[in-house]
Amino acid sequence: MYKDLEDKKFDYLILGTNLTESALSAYLAKSRYKIIQIDITKSYGGDCKNFNLRDMENFMKELNENTIKDSYLKNITLINRDIKKDAEPLLEKENYRQYNFDLNPKFLYAKSKSSTELIDSRASNYIEFNSLKKIFFMYEDKFLNVPFSKSEIFISNDLDLLEKQKLLNFIFSVMKLKNNNVDVNSTVDVKKDIELDDDFLFNEIKNNLNQKAIEFLKKHFNDKITDMILLILSNQNLNNMEMTVDQMCDNIYKFLISVQIYDSTPFLIPQYGSSEFTQAMSRLSAVNGSIFFNK
């Protein structure tokens, strides 16, 4: 095959199959450029690589072969386990692809720039998606289930009545605030007139858009609701002290308009892990004439 390439000319050589390289390859190939893409590893993905159970077994074997000797360790005891023995029953059932170890887990909002690009580029034809069924967050010493809809909030056992009312009122306030300034990437029509139990919170949000989000939340909610809003609804770290109320509302609105698009939750995940994104882009590039080399 190498001889077949001797007389070929390429416009671009791309090294690696990370998400950025794969997306660039797909774009250039669709633009009629001649691409050759090389990855020194056996599989696609780079930093977004994921292993099924069999891949993980082989990866662990390679690690064991390259493990440093005990004599170099002063205060660490190496414990070797037979990975193959532990995984044997699962491997024999030929369902090893149902178990994935993702190096860099990623999910998509059902309505977002990324999901729109995947559909428009037809890369989505090469990916199978599942909806993320449940999301939990840690509060004190318990895992709490995050409700996604009005009905789920009402029946939640993790929130008391006052917390439910406050959370619903906050969600409706954000929707009402952002409905008048819908992002161009949103294709979801949301009701323009939303009834609020109390306009006070809506006015507080509207009049404090430049305030630090963490300060605003701590003023109006207890720690449980504050954590839920920051971690899940706005997809932020609890230590993010710089995010404003306006930025928080933008993030929450993106979350809310993705609910009930494909399922009750707003998130989509590739069935076989994040490397599916890079593989889809690579396949799209290959369909348009690119040549790939892996180890």
Residue ranges and their predicted role:
Residues 13-15, 29-54, 64-75:
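Glycine-rich FAD pyrophosphate-binding loop
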Residues 12-14, 25-28, 35-39, 118, ...:
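Structural signal for hydrophobic/aromatic residues that build the beta-strand cores
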Residues 82-245:
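Mobile amphipathic helical/loop "lid" adjacent to a hydrophobic cofactor/ligand pocket
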Residues 1-9, 59-70, 187-188, 242-250:
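Eukaryotic N-terminal low-complexity, Ser/Thr- and Lys/Arg-rich leader segments
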Residues 253-295:
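Helical element adjacent to the flavin cofactor pocket in flavoenzyme catalytic cores
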Residues 4-20, 36:
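Beta1/beta-strand and adjacent pyrophosphate-binding region of the FAD-binding site
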Residues 20-24, 52, 110-114, 213, ...:
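Alpha-helical interaction elements in eukaryotic regulators
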Residues 237-262:
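Active-site-adjacent "gating/activation" loops or surface patches in catalytic cores
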